[in-house]
């Protein structure tokens, strides 16, 4: 029996994608091979690779000025890879910290430069807000400005993206990429692990403006130097072939859904239903300012936290899984990525109301 999976990542995949992957597992398109067995330089995999790149470019409307790279290492590795590729001769980069993930990025950058904290969204209740552009205190000549546009743990999503002129804006988009249209031209670099909205764990997507490819530090490993990866079409080292294949299937699924505008409308509906239920309740609480509440990751707390385990057990009995909040913040978290259907959110909301009634 399939359940409703609210995991923050690895996360739910579209059932259509899973069924297609199962059907093609032993014999991809008459090749007599599984994708797992293919040479990454063979014509079969190259067709998968090129189609995935083209579909992602189409979905996000990536301009010709930007290159799309498939790498390994996940979003955490990019926290080191970004400064090694962008610092050049500069000694500092600016960070807008809106949650746990941008804090990790800031801390990792200390190994390569002297990062400058341009703004923080931390309050007495934790990370509950996104500083406005007027609050950003940028340094004189930063190599780049780093922002995590959706904080998976804290549930803070930044929607308003400022124009920084000549300073490259770097965004960790791991947990909201492909959930809504984006103006890619505003960014110098976008990066994200695949295991939330793109596909399965194993591949990391980097979208980088081409004029930024000459800034790498000499200590940057060749396999993670964006210029080298770009010049070799993401094939400098053996890529995560099956993860790219699954990502490609997800891209095709998104196109069948009507693209990112249609997906965004669906995601807005799902998030509104869940937040409205929380806000109308006297039992559940979300601490994030409404204007920056994440559409993808919805943390919430029970009024009586001694009931947490009972809540999770009851949810599991109804086929509602992976609702436990991150260990650093506690409570609950429902991750409602693209592949989580509206029916799943409705089932969760019904359960939340039932649990509150029983508790009362």
UniProtKB/Swiss-Prot annotation:
<keyword id="KW-0664">Pyridoxine biosynthesis</keyword>
<dbReference type="GO" id="GO:0004648">
    <property type="term" value="F:O-phospho-L-serine:2-oxoglutarate aminotransferase activity"/>
</dbReference>
<dbReference type="InterPro" id="IPR000192">
    <property type="entry name" value="Aminotrans_V_dom"/>
</dbReference>
<feature type="modified residue" description="N6-(pyridoxal phosphate)lysine">
    <location>
        <position position="196"/>
    </location>
</feature>
<dbReference type="InterPro" id="IPR015424">
    <property type="entry name" value="PyrdxlP-dep_Trfase"/>
</dbReference>
<dbReference type="InterPro" id="IPR022278">
    <property type="entry name" value="Pser_aminoTfrase"/>
</dbReference>
<keyword id="KW-0963">Cytoplasm</keyword>
<dbReference type="Pfam" id="PF00266">
    <property type="entry name" value="Aminotran_5"/>
</dbReference>
<dbReference type="GO" id="GO:0030170">
    <property type="term" value="F:pyridoxal phosphate binding"/>
</dbReference>
<dbReference type="GO" id="GO:0006564">
    <property type="term" value="P:L-serine biosynthetic process"/>
</dbReference>
<comment type="similarity">
    <text>Belongs to the class-V pyridoxal-phosphate-dependent aminotransferase family. SerC subfamily.</text>
</comment>
<keyword id="KW-0032">Aminotransferase</keyword>
<feature type="binding site">
    <location>
        <position position="101"/>
    </location>
    <ligand>
        <name>pyridoxal 5'-phosphate</name>
    </ligand>
</feature>
<feature type="binding site">
    <location>
        <position position="195"/>
    </location>
    <ligand>
        <name>pyridoxal 5'-phosphate</name>
    </ligand>
</feature>
<comment type="pathway">
    <text>Amino-acid biosynthesis; L-serine biosynthesis; L-serine from 3-phospho-D-glycerate: step 2/3.</text>
</comment>
<keyword id="KW-0663">Pyridoxal phosphate</keyword>
<dbReference type="InterPro" id="IPR020578">
    <property type="entry name" value="Aminotrans_V_PyrdxlP_BS"/>
</dbReference>
<protein>
    <recommendedName>
        <fullName>Phosphoserine aminotransferase</fullName>
        <ecNumber>2.6.1.52</ecNumber>
    </recommendedName>
</protein>
<feature type="binding site">
    <location>
        <position position="152"/>
    </location>
    <ligand>
        <name>pyridoxal 5'-phosphate</name>
    </ligand>
</feature>
<dbReference type="InterPro" id="IPR015422">
    <property type="entry name" value="PyrdxlP-dep_Trfase_small"/>
</dbReference>
<feature type="binding site">
    <location>
        <position position="172"/>
    </location>
    <ligand>
        <name>pyridoxal 5'-phosphate</name>
    </ligand>
</feature>
<keyword id="KW-0028">Amino-acid biosynthesis</keyword>
<dbReference type="GO" id="GO:0005737">
    <property type="term" value="C:cytoplasm"/>
</dbReference>
<dbReference type="GO" id="GO:0008615">
    <property type="term" value="P:pyridoxine biosynthetic process"/>
</dbReference>
<feature type="binding site">
    <location>
        <position position="41"/>
    </location>
    <ligand>
        <name>L-glutamate</name>
    </ligand>
</feature>
<keyword id="KW-0718">Serine biosynthesis</keyword>
<comment type="pathway">
    <text>Cofactor biosynthesis; pyridoxine 5'-phosphate biosynthesis; pyridoxine 5'-phosphate from D-erythrose 4-phosphate: step 3/5.</text>
</comment>
<comment type="function">
    <text>Catalyzes the reversible conversion of 3-phosphohydroxypyruvate to phosphoserine and of 3-hydroxy-2-oxo-4-phosphonooxybutanoate to phosphohydroxythreonine.</text>
</comment>
<keyword id="KW-0808">Transferase</keyword>
<feature type="binding site">
    <location>
        <begin position="237"/>
        <end position="238"/>
    </location>
    <ligand>
        <name>pyridoxal 5'-phosphate</name>
    </ligand>
</feature>
<comment type="subunit">
    <text>Homodimer.</text>
</comment>
<dbReference type="InterPro" id="IPR015421">
    <property type="entry name" value="PyrdxlP-dep_Trfase_major"/>
</dbReference>
